[in-house]
Amino acid sequence: MDVFRTDRIRNVVLLGHGGSGKTTLAEAMAYLAGMTNRLGRVEDGNTVSDFDKEEIKRHFSVSTTLIPVPWDKVKVNVLDTPGYFDFVGEVEEAVSAADAAIIVVSGKAGVQVGTQKAWNLCEKYKLPRMFFVTDMDVDDVSYRKVVEDLTELYGKKIAPLHFPIREDGKFVGYVNVVKQAGRRYIDKAGKEPCDIPEYLNEYLEKYHDILMESVAETSEEFMDRYFEGDEFSVTEVSAALATNVQDASIVPVCMGSPINLRGVSNLLDDICGYFPSPDKRSCNGISQKTNEIFEANYDFAKTKSAYVWKTIVDPFLGKYSLIKVASGVIKSDDTLLNVDKGEEERLNKLYVLEGSKPIEVPELHAGDIGAIAKLASVQTGDSLAAKAAPVLYPKAVISTPYTYKRYKAVNKGDEDKIAQALAKMTSEDKTLRVVNDAANRQTLLYGMGDQHLDIVVSKLKERYKVDVELSKPKVAFRETIRKNSDVEGKHKKQSGGHGQYGHVKMRFEPSGDLETPYVFEQVVVGGAVPKNYFPAVEKGLQECVLKGPLAAYPVVGVKATLYDGSYHPVDSSEMAFKMATILAFKKGFMDASPVLLEPIVSMKVTVPDKYTGDVMGDLNKRRGRVLGMNPDHAGNTIIEADVPQLEIYGYSTTLRSMTGGSGDFSYEFARYEQAPNDIQAKEIEARASKLEAAE
């Protein structure tokens, strides 16, 4: 592939609801640009984008794919992203590397939750954007309805650039609103001028007025001319669009049928004409030599630097670090410093990726997106720069996973293989996490949803030939006491010869601090227990609080006071006093009204106002306590509640079902609280075998 200068590059991410047609659009772009000799179909599993076996099997994208599309002497780096919410991390990574977005809307389904999430992501990253409405070949699709819905949501900045011409319900051409001209399709990719059907004149006038009003609002001069009734020329309209699309004050709407290659060439023309090249966008890092802001701004004349926005780990091809060049020109024989790790890396080769196909290139200019193979120290988010001018770039903010399940190997002996495989997968997928829960002797797999975790299991089997099974995780209960007790513990074995003797009298009471296992005090007078045995008593306590007498859970919030006892000058030992303490603890704990504590999480649930009642009702069923509700800037309600961790298992799926995918939630551990009696009884019964094993 040719090397492209910065001003001839467009980095465009495809966003939208799952099933809206992003991958089909990307495939049509690649075909029209001559990159493929056949138009692949998602259903047939032969598209450039969806090459992963899971994607082919499931007929939807699960990872971001890069397709560099050459068009009119411009390279359009198309980032095709998943639409399903479980793979939002892939989307966030792609957005961090993009300079503009196409939000794809299915004409059949209309504006969906994923459409609005895509818009919000563009707002967050201040990305220029266009809408592309697909499925125009379907007879009953209403383009006007989609435009009206978008305008209702986002106001007058919505500006349709094209609308369809239909004959007998068939999509046969389109009207160019800027040029006020009709075009008829003559074959899959061709078109010719045609008259605008009379029935469409009212819509042309309507959409042209919308566009002119949008253009007029971009400057005082245009506004004055608009009110004076002046017409803007095509050149003026195009120039205004180019300026104002880039600051998102105008958001064009295009349409077509990618499966029939219709409307796709128009979209590529608009991408090249209206979207910014990287050097029109800002990109700042911190110089590690001066600690001052380094304004890279994708300037090819500045010192070379880049950031890694994604990692791909392929069992056969190896590891690829996907970079965006922030400044300068990076060449295949460069040696760059991994600024995060302080290690130098020799590049050897540079690539651009066409789906799964790496194509070697000699250099990448500022703003371009490429790949480097086998960088040992480099991870997603790392910065690369010349050693003489190290620059650190901010890392993309990736969503935190809250759905988790317990996993274990199906076949004994596979544990190490699974751990190694998951290490590779977590380097590739930043929303996948592995957590070792030592207290409950389980390993947890965190992801963005059940579908995400199911695909992880499938990939482990397909790629790494290991089987794991997922199950409901155990919750980390704790044990404490509510009352006081006064007990003694005596460990005595004297059967001739050197015996064992330890005797303690102790008081147990709540310490009031549920974050600390125990507090130990000694108030022994007169040497009833010599001071040199106090550490042995504490060792006994330390051992006891690891597994409590009630249900073998860790103990918290206990104050233990050693106030008396006795010893034998020959038979007493540290071990004897430790054993005496263990006996005292078990009796004293059970005599002090022991209870199980369950973990409580502080949860924030963000939902559209219309779902607030349903969500609150569900939280109440989960024993949640709603603490407050607050509006946000996007017409949503943020519900704050304390909920037992035991009750949030599966919440991601439930919330998605209740809100049609529009709800989000987060939580963090808050504290421990006494569990209800029925929960305690059930848990104590279930843990009886562990208590017996601890005896």
Features from the language model and the residues they span:
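Structural and coupling elements of P-loop NTPases
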Residues: 1-695
